[in-house]
């Protein structure tokens, strides 16, 4: 039986939060009881420190809040909640939203257009999400909007802009950059060979180093079996940075399931 941290708290608010139900999503079932307990402790603190702001009529209940907090804290389970400093609000639309985008082309001309976004992470501002894509982040598919945006926040701790290199020791930067760009090249080669829809990794990862880090962070936590075999050196760097090994968790869970199945009479 898990000794859940909220069960020993005197606070009625903490006791009322549906953490056990929130943990029931497929993405979190590979965690050990100890990891789940630690994750809930971080998520409780996250909800105390951050403000979740529903927009455009979206209804935010306690279960949704708990699951959002758990997904935010999964990448920093071993790093610590202080890695999520730098923002205080999470804005949540009910669905993908339209924003005005401004960009400069190769010859210096500035263009303006309206585009549909799933999420945004401002360096000195809030994280913006949408509930439809948050729901799609509960499974183990390789897609996770919250982890993607958290990865951008972790990335910018290393400098003024997202570069694809998180805050790691200086001696490791060159190796990280080498392996990250090699992964981008391999992903692009696969796209050219089989097309975007058939590629094993989301094509967005090949667009730019910062997006590669964010996309591969999604796969690291939600589809490690697709990330690790294709990019073993970069996988080890991610394990070292996040101080977690989701593939080992997956194998442990599969072994447990296999053992249980063979002992059913």
UniProtKB/Swiss-Prot annotation:
Belongs to the MtfA family. It comes from the Bacteria. Its main location: cytoplasm. One of its GO terms (molecular function) is aminopeptidase activity. Pfam families: Peptidase_M90. The gene is mtfA. It is found in: Cytoplasm. GO terms for cellular component: cytosol. CDD domains: Peptidase_M90_mtfA (cd20169). Involved in the modulation of the activity of the glucose-phosphotransferase system (glucose-PTS). Interacts with the transcriptional repressor Mlc, preventing its interaction with DNA and leading to the modulation of expression of genes regulated by Mlc, including ptsG, which encodes the PTS system glucose-specific EIICB component. InterPro entries: MetalloPept_cat_dom_sf, MtfA_enterob, MtfA_fam, MtfA_N. This is Mlc titration factor A. The lineage of its organism: Bacteria, Pseudomonadati, Pseudomonadota, Gammaproteobacteria, Enterobacterales. Keywords: Aminopeptidase, Cytoplasm, Hydrolase, Metal-binding, Metalloprotease, Protease, Zinc. It is an enzyme of class 3 (hydrolase). HAMAP family: MtfA. Binds 1 zinc ion per subunit. Zn(2+) binds at residues 111, 148, 152, 211. GO terms for biological process: proteolysis. SUPFAM superfamilies: Metalloproteases ('zincins'), catalytic domain. PANTHER family: MTFA PEPTIDASE, PROTEIN MTFA. Its EC number is 3.4.11.-. The keyword Kinase does not apply. The keyword Protease applies. Its cofactor is Zn(2+).
